[in-house]
Swiss-Prot record:
The gene is RGS12. One of its GO terms (cellular component) is synapse. It comes from Homo sapiens. It comes from the Eukaryota. Regulates G protein-coupled receptor signaling cascades. Inhibits signal transduction by increasing the GTPase activity of G protein alpha subunits, thereby driving them into their inactive GDP-bound form. This is Regulator of G-protein signaling 12.
Length: 1447
């Protein structure tokens, strides 16, 4: 080291100026083929064999003077790299062949010392080169570093050390004797070498070395006492910006900014051994031995990265000559942050065995973590050991240390750091800092073979690296020749002899370990007098936390990305007292060295070839020698030319190039056994594939994904190649109501891969695509022009390219319209931000305004995007990617490219499909998520077990236990195991029991979502999800006027009046005419109180006018008597039963539907006539205006949800396309509803008198059959066996409860449609997880219903065992007069106003009978707001604030 002013005092004899020449280098596929180090000027540190740079004759050591006619002789390192990186074609450079190919140090901050006089030159400002520094920093951040061009090279780097061997003398032992302090050069004199006087001055000016020279005798003790050695990854170093000495928080934020910066740049870490000695921290590689050392007195503190706990930083301070902390003129401290990471993926012993062999040590079992001490699972043990070394540095550092420990989670998101040094030196400091800086060396391997014939000076200036475990070691390793080890001070002198020939630009400061030996603190006080040691073995706050086991912000945490790996939990290291004293000691006795060995002997020992570069076998014959090599320290020759960046080349070819294709990766990846150390002798460049980036762990896979989100913005084609990209793009399209585009494209892409000779498969797939996307009655039609429309006859001769034109149209539509909007969407922005910050990609369900809209009805990746695309016709739910019979090889070949075809459906086989067995064909696995297309067929949402689909998501996954995290109401959270075959309710019941929570009075939500989950789903779909459990209020409500009781579950925060009003309105009552009180009390209840006050209570509603209630009850009792005759007359399906129950409105609807009466089945007409007779006898015809008003209400509400693909949301603007319009015969009944309504009821609608008819004999009304809310399961028939819907089994009493009044066909149609819509809408975009899709679902839920005399157990589920949700096709069970409704069956009673009741308690023209019958026995209406209103509700759905939801 030298000061800026020292250069003027020394003679600098040297040869003539180096030869300057101009070269032109063409850019190859992997770049130009060279790496740089140093600055002012930059020097080539490595030239790859066979690269363009090698072809034009560039050699390591050449200086770059100009780039593309821009003088860069005085430019900084990063500016030169930026200039070269911007050049895309031929690179014009002017290079100077320095004497002996001299190479500069690679630190960014050093001035130029390569001109003849060696004066310190000012750095060339970036503006002179036309580079904006801010712009450069931003680009580096965005691109993840400025060396992308370097990483694209798949081959190994190889320096040109062989030609250099011809020019340089081979160093023999006889030649080594000429290396004396008085000699100025070796073979080629170096003009920048230090003189003998300067060496002496430098040594004596350094407080550390002066200690060693003044007190030789005190350092005869063993200096290699090692606390612990751990394998960590080194990312790089950044010099911290100067901060005011009284701003502790600013300093801490700057350090965290450094860690964030290096982490965001995605620099590939280099594995090093971090040896935490008793007085310093050493870094060693598997090739070069000790490459850096951080003395304890320079360790300011260490901190963990707040964003990613795997990363941690060591902060080193600079000290002045007197031992005090170095401060600049303004009083700011000069510090550097060195960033490391602990790779939890290496925790497993089997995984890191190869690394341990490479580093030459044996793993030490750690009983505390059941792992190996050298491979920690987190950064916590490393930081705990390092904290032991802290010295007292004054109040500032102590304050920063305290903040780092106690305030570690405080996020300092601003990045205050300067640009990182691009060549990632372990130290990055100013030239004039002399020996105060940390050693800067290469982390790569040696440039020459370490053998007897190797040259000791391959690449003058320290190109030759000392191999790990080479015989020349300190006083703790036996000398291979039997000579006594060196004394510490002699080692220091020997080291400076060597440094003399390294050149002044080489930053040299390796205080030998012997200078800080295991001297007790008492003796150290005399030994190190004046050196400012004042060692405090444990700072107060560190000691306190160590004793208490408190880890503050570095508490135990999980480092793995999935968050559930149990082995990754950080644990405290064992206390120092429990670690055996000899656990890390080198075995064997250590001879005391002679105190006065001649200097010439030191030199011979230091530089003799046999001593320096002796073969490894000479020192690894015994176990003791192996341990010596493991912890052998050496003096660490500096290798400035080999330092390039933090992305280091190690022994094995393991680096993945991010931009390389999968095929290239397969061919480029080299396994552990394929390369030997000899093959990698010249591998010192980051161009190679060699690193630990793809150690046998999932880390390699993670790196492949690191830039995947950014790659989506490269092109639309690139997006479609990434299954994850397709998934998020599908989510975006679903929000845009155009998901059918990507589904159609995927279907066509899959169709294109069907073999042309497989006519049967082609025909099947072609018809499926045509019927689903292209025909006039398509369920999910795509928007293509008329020229691309296909006629039915083309399906007779299908061929793989038949949909090419249509696919291209949709592709262009997505590419030029949807894709650009996707890149601007909050969903993509959130993804790219998560990738930059190293987080897992967000759940699109939780991204504001970007998740798959709650209006969408399907699951994650192939759902039916809007209600209008549903179909009510009986149709197979076949998906695009179900099994292809025996063509397993075909499936593997095709499925590799498309996320939606990777997981096969577990549907029936092709043979069963052909026989028409479509019951289970509605499962469509797409991108690992499920889609159901019940669409009116017998296949229902509930009849399919989600676990089937989930089992196909990752067939190659191991069977490891899966977990989810549930946040409980008390603020705690717990991890719950999920398993296929067990429903969510099953796993939730056990959790609720353990925590004393009534499972029936709780709802489960996704974190960030507001829809409760459907609890009968398979629990395996909750893997790695964050959920929250919310309590609900359960109470019983007795409706005395109608002799009914209901069990209700309500949101605790709702007022009593808001909960009760919609309930009583549902039963045709008016809350204002009722007296509300608790059972057993006479005082009226406060309707403004929160409903939580009624938890577990029994609330009674009585008529203020008893006579009115009696009359209403008498009317109801008279209804079923007439109905029984009609019900028992013949077997009826759901539609017939519904019509029998619609008395009030049937007559009015009849007039509207007169035109189409003749189209109905004759049998239906007879039924309708019988129903009409009953209606005429019992009721008068209601006002047509009211019916029209109700139709208008339904129409408006539904049109709000029938958002077509053009995005029209209002009925006035909605023009239905042809495929949604009904035939003219049923136009009077037409509602602007989706195709589900049009097609589901066009066959069944009452065109003659407006009433529903029974389905055709072959049709089954599945939604009602599977619903326990079916009329057949009304009170009195709740336990009837399954049969044709609506029939009353022979011998069983007909429904005779007071709620079995006939019902309007309109409400019936709405209810039937609601069943279809509900099933579709429950599958919300949340990874296939079903949620109850209702806007007010969390506010009020009907738990059960029965007579007033019914026991509580039939209305409210017992707290201990939550009520089981009936399966989709299971009939309800109960007793006569009472029944239990499934928990998650939702009936939306949106916004019921408190208008005065009409005749018999009806509301606004709707009869009381229909309203009550629907509430008791009718099927639920849809959870969609558009289907919410029922006949018993007013015509203004959005004018009231009262909401309720019945289950």
């Amino acid at each position: 080291m030298f000061r800026a002013g020292e250069a003027s005092k020394r003679p600098l004899p040297g040869p003539s100026p180096p030869r300057v020449r101009s070269v032109e280098v063409a850019r190859g596929r992997a770049g130009y083929g060279f790496t740089l180090s140093g600055q002012a000027p930059c020097v080539l540190s490595c030239v790859m064999r066979g690269s363009p740079a090698d072809f034009v004759g560039l050699r390591a050591g050449d200086q770059i003077l100009a780039v593309n006619e821009i003088n860069v002789k005085k430019a900084s390192h990063e500016d030169v790299v930026k200039l070269i990186g911007k050049c895309s074609g031929v690179l014009h450079m002017v290079i100077a062949e320095g004497v002996g190919r001299f190479e500069s140090c690679s630190s960014d901050e050093e001035g130029g010392l390569y001109e003849g006089k060696g004066w310190l030159k000012p750095k060339l400002d970036s503006k002179a080169l036309g580079i904006n520094r801010a712009e450069r920093v931003v680009e580096e951040m965005q691109s993840g570093g400025i060396f992308n061009m370097i990483f694209e090279n798949p081959s190994l780097c190889a320096s040109n050390s062989e030609p250099l061997k011809l020019k340089q003398r081979s160093l023999s032992e006889s030649a080594a004797t000429r290396f004396d302090v008085g000699h100025e050069s070796i073979n080629n004199p170096n003009p920048n070498m230090l003189s003998k006087e300067e060496i002496s001055k430098v040594i004596h000016d350094d407080s550390v070395f002066s200690i060693g020279l003044e007190s030789h005798d005190d350092f005869a003790l063993d200096a290699s006492i090692l606390n612990v050695a751990m394998i960590v990854g080194y990312l790089g170093s950044i010099e911290l910006p100067s901060t005011s000495s009284n701003l502790e928080s600013d300093s801490l934020q700057a350090i965290r900014g450094c860690m964030r910066r290096l982490r965001a740049e995605q620099k590939i870490h280099s594995l090093v051994t971090m040896k935490i000695m008793h007085d310093c921290v050493q870094l060693s590689t598997d090739k070069a031995g000790v490459v850096a050392e951080y003395p304890a007195e320079k360790l300011a503190f260490s901190a963990v990265c707040p964003d990613d706990r795997r990363f941690f930083g060591l902060v080193t301070m600079q000290t002045n000559d007197d031992g005090s902390l170095a401060q600049e003129e303004e009083g700011a401290l000069r510090t550097s942050c060195h960033v490391f990471m602990v790779d939890p993926d290496l925790f497993n012993h089997k995984i890191h065995q190869g690394i341990a062999r490479r580093f030459g040590f044996e793993c030490t079992a750690d009983p505390d973590t059941n792992g190996c001490l050298e491979f920690p699972a987190s950064s916590l043990p490393v930081l705990q050991f390092i904290s032991v070394l802290y010295r007292d540095m004054g109040e500032l550092i102590e304050g920063m240390r305290a903040r780092a420990f106690l305030d570690g989670d405080a996020d300092a998101h601003q990045n205050n750091s300067t640009s990182s040094n691009s060549d990632s030196g372990i130290g990055n400091f100013h030239q004039e800092e002399k020996s105060n800086r940390v050693l800067v060396v290469d982390l790569g391997g040696s440039s020459s073979r370490h053998g007897p014939g190797g040259s000791a000076w391959d690449g003058v200036g320290g190109r030759g690296a000392q191999p790990w475990g080479a015989p020349w070691t300190g006083p703790f390793c036996p000398d291979p020749e039997g000579s006594p080890p060196f004394e510490a001070a002699h080692q220091t002198d020997r080291f400076w002899d060597l440094n003399k020939h390294l050149g002044p630009a080489s930053p040299v400061e390796v205080p030998p370990a012997s200078l800080r030996s295991s001297v007790p603190p008492s003796k150290r006080g005399t030994v190190g007098a004046g050196c400012g040691f004042n060692q405090r073995w444990l700072p107060v706050h560190v000691l306190r936390e160590w004793q208490c086991g408190h880890t503050s912000d570095q508490d135990s945490y999980t480092d793995s990305t999935d968050g559930w790996s149990s082995i990754n939990c950080g644990t405290l290291p064992p206390p120092m007292s429990k670690i055996p004293a000899d656990r890390y000691r080198v075995e064997g006795s250590f001879a005391q060295p002679p105190l006065n060995a001649p200097k010439r002997e030191w030199s011979r020992k230091a530089f003799g070839m046999q001593s320096i570069f002796g073969p490894h076998r000479n020192v690894r014959k015994t176990k003791e020698d192996k341990k010596g090599s493991k912890f052998g320290r050496g003096t660490g020759l500096t290798q400035p030319s080999q330092r390039t960046s933090a992305r280091r080349s190690f022994g094995r070819s393991k680096r993945f190039s991010i931009t390389r294709s999968l095929d290239d990766l397969e061919s480029a990846t080299v396994s552990d056994g394929e390369l030997t150390g000899a093959d990698l002798k010249d591998c010192v460049s980051n161009n190679s594939l060699s690193s630990n980036a793809s150690l046998p762990s999932v880390q390699s896979c993670r790196r492949l994904r690191e830039r995947r989100v950014a790659s989506w913005a490269v092109s639309f084609e690139r997006l479609l190649q990434d299954p994850v990209g397709v998934r998020y793009f599908s989510d975006f399209l679903r929000k845009e109501f155009s998901e059918e585009n990507i589904l159609f494209w995927q279907a066509c892409e899959y169709f294109n891969h069907v073999p042309a000779h497989d006519k049967k498969e082609l025909s099947y797939r072609a018809r499926e695509i045509f019927s689903k996307f292209l025909c006039s009655k398509a369920t999910t039609p795509v928007n293509i022009d008329s020229q691309a429309q296909l006629a039915d006859d083309v399906l007779r001769a299908p061929h793989p390219d038949m949909f090419k034109e249509q696919q291209l149209q949709i592709f262009n539509l997505m590419k030029f319209d949807s894709y650009t909007r996707f890149l601007k969407s909050p969903l993509y922005q959130e993804c790219i931000l998560a990738e930059v910050e190293g987080r897992a990609l967000p759940d699109s369900q939780q991204v504001p305004s970007s998740p798959a809209s709650k209006h969408s009805l399907g699951s994650d990746h192939s759902s039916v995007s809007t209600p209008k695309k549903l179909s009510g016709k009986s149709k197979s739910g076949r998906s695009l990617n179900e099994e292809l019979g025996d063509e397993d090889s075909e499936k593997k070949r095709k499925g590799a490219f498309f996320s939606w075809s990777r997981t096969r459906s577990t549907g029936r086989s092709q043979k069963k499909r052909e026989h028409g067995d479509h019951a289970d064909d509605a499962l469509h696995a797409n991108g690992g998520l499920c889609r159901r297309e019940s669409q009116g067929s017998v296949s229902s949402a509930g009849s399919l077990d989600l676990s089937e689909a989930c089992r196909t998501l990752a067939p190659e996954k191991d069977k490891a236990t899966k977990h989810c995290c549930i946040h409980l109401p008390d603020g705690t959270s717990c991890v719950v195991a999920v398993k296929a075959g067990f429903s969510i309710k099953d796993i939730l019941s056990g959790l609720c029991e353990r925590h004393g929570i009534n499972g029936a009075a709780a709802d489960l939500f996704l974190v960030g979502g507001d829809k409760p989950l459907v609890l009968h789903q398979d629990s395996s779909i909750l893997e790695s999800r964050d959920l929250r459990l919310e309590k609900r209020t359960l109470f019983r409500l007795d409706l005395v006027p109608i002799n009914r009781s209901v069990g209700l579950k309500a949101k605790p925060t709702k007022p009593v009046t808001e909960v009760l009003r919609p309930v009583v309105a549902r039963y045709g009552l008016d809350l204002s005419g009722l007296l509300v009180r608790l059972s057993g009390e006479k005082e009226p209840l406060d309707l403004g109180a929160p409903i939580s006050s009624l938890d577990g209570q029994r609330v009674v509603l009585e008529e203020k006018d008893p006579s009115r209630g009696k009359a209403s009850a008498d009317k109801q009792k008279g209804v079923p008597v007439k109905q029984n005759t009609a019900v028992n007359s013949s077997s009826r399906n759901h539609s017939a039963t519904g019509e029998e129950r619609t008395l009030g409105k049937s007559n009015s609807i009849k007039i509207k539907g007169e035109n189409g009466k003749n189209a109905r089945d004759p049998r239906l007409s007879k039924r309708e006539e019988s129903i009409a007779k009953i209606g005429k006898k019992k009721y008068q015809k209601i006002n047509l205006d009211e019916a029209e008003e109700f139709f208008e209400l339904i129409s408006k509400a539904q049109s709000n949800r029938a958002d077509d693909q053009r995005g029209l949301l209002r009925k006035e603007d909605l023009v239905l396309p042809e495929f949604l319009r009904l035939p003219p015969g049923s136009t009077e009944l037409t509602l602007p509803t989706p195709a589900a309504v049009a097609k589901g009821f066009s066959k069944r609608s009452a065109t003659g008198n407006g009433r529903e008819s029974a389905s055709q004999p072959g049709e089954q009304w599945e939604p009602v059959q599977e619903s326990s809310d079916s009329p057949s399961t009304s009170p009195g028939s709740a336990s009837s066996p399954p049969g044709p819907p609506g029939t009353t089994p022979p011998g069983q009493k007909s429904p005779s409860g007071p709620f079995c009044t006939p019902q309007s066909p309109v409400s019936l149609a709405q209810e039937g449609t609601a069943q279809i819509w509900k099933r579709q809408s429950q599958e919300v975009e949340a990874g296939g997880i079903q949620t109850v899709e209702d806007e007010h679902v969390a506010e009020l839920t009907l738990m059960g219903e029965g007579d007033i005399s019914s026991p509580n157990s039939t209305l409210l589920p017992p707290p201990s065992t939550p009520q089981e949700v009936p399966g989709p096709s299971r009939p309800g069970s109960g007793t006569h007069g009472s029944r239990d409704l499934p928990v998650n069956r939702i009936i939306d009673v949106d916004l019921v106003t408190g208008s005065a009741p009409g005749r018999d308690g009806g509301i606004a023209g709707a009869q009381a009978g229909p309203g009550r019958s629907q509430a008791s026995g009718g099927p639920p209406t849809s959870d969609l707001p558009g289907l919410g209103p029922v006949p018993g509700e007013p015509a203004k759905p959005k004018t009231s604030a009262h909401h309720a939801t019945f289950v």
